[in-house]
Amino acid sequence: MAVTTRTVSEICAAAKRAAWELAAAPTEVKDAALEATARLLGERSAEILEANAADLADERAAGLTSALRDRLTLSEARIDAMAEGVRTVAALEDPIGEELERKALASGLGLRKVRVPLGVVAVVYEARPNVTIDCAALTIKSGNAIVLRGSSYAERSNGALAAIVREALAEAGLPEDAALLVAGGGRAELAELATQEGTVDLLIPRGGEGLKKSLQDVATVPVIYAAAGNCHVYVHADADLEMARRIAYNAKVQRPGVCNAAETLLVHSDVASEFLPGALADLHSAGVELVGDERARELAGAVEVGVATAEDWGTEYLDLKMVVGVVGSLEEAVDHVNSHGTSHSEAIVTSSEAAADRFTTGVDAAVVYTNASTRFTDGFEFGMGAEIGNSTQKLHARGPIGLRELTTYKYVVRGDGQVRE
């Protein structure tokens, strides 16, 4: 089984031993493990769905919002998508061993800088079982072992998926302990995982501000926060308004419970009276609850728009709710995004290259779009096959965390007897 009775410390130590072996594995062996994972996902789909149904029926899931239940829910289509994502990762170029630099030193030594795995990557995530497979695929391909700590809501689903990964590793001749799942979803296990210096090389928590804050005070291992996404769509004065309506609708409605969904719509005052009635009617018809500033409410037409509070502008709803504001200039839009955003994904709709350039250089975010939905911030969409999360930090990775973001480098030096004088 993927879930063991070992302590967190024992799990991380076992993963470290597995990581040493996996780091030296040839590309074809790692790819064989991934192909086996994809195949087993199809063969075991009934078992996976049974485990997922039990999670959804559990009383612990009864109070989940519709968005969180959507995150927790698996289907044949989502399992097929997971398998396809694994195959895509298998087909990607292996980053391990890539030569980043080569030079001859004055001492006569030959120096090479080569890409190597991080070692053990621990991932903490909430109610999205597909993360189990996405993360495992990326870590296997990049030569890392993984320790997974999922939500208690998805305990059965995660267990079924992690067991498949372990079986696939063994089938390929790799150590099963390269993929381990920590049982229990309590704070004690989380705090212990965050303090495994010497065995955990990187911790990636995927979740909201509550998870981030719970780790900031205790973590002693390196952490990359795949944190909240309070994303904005800004409609500039010269925007194609039909395009802007499609983008705003897609960014909010297509899948509201994910971190790259838009939470705020900003509109330039020059086009607000023309744009807002239709755009807000679109959103309202999709069940989006709308709140806004005074100007947006005045221009909403027949659509009911509530009063936005100060907290609304900084909230990641992860649901069918959106805050709407009218701004007087591009500079005001940039200032608003930088003041209230989470450095995740931001979008401008404009026909002006100058406006696009000002927005993309002025906004402090991992991903900035011109004339496109924020929903594209995703490892699969970016050609990475999958992602472990989206980093809103600037060190060690920013944006989707794919294969190369799960590596570091070492210097390999070759001599013929040199000693330093």
Region locations from a protein language model:
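ALDH superfamily catalytic-core signature
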Residues: 2, 6, 126-128, 134-145, ...
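Flexible, glycine/charged-enriched surface loops at secondary-structure junctions
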Residues: 25-32, 96, 172-179, 255-261, ...
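Conserved small-residue-rich beta-alpha loop and adjacent elements
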Residues: 91, 95-167, 172, 200, ...
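Solvent-exposed alpha-helices and their adjacent loops that cap or buttress functional pockets
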Residues: 102-103, 111-117, 139-140, 171-175, ...
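Conserved C-terminal structural/oligomerization subdomain of aldehyde/semialdehyde dehydrogenase
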Residues: 118, 309-421
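Short acidic active-site motifs
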Residues: 188-192, 211, 329-332, 355
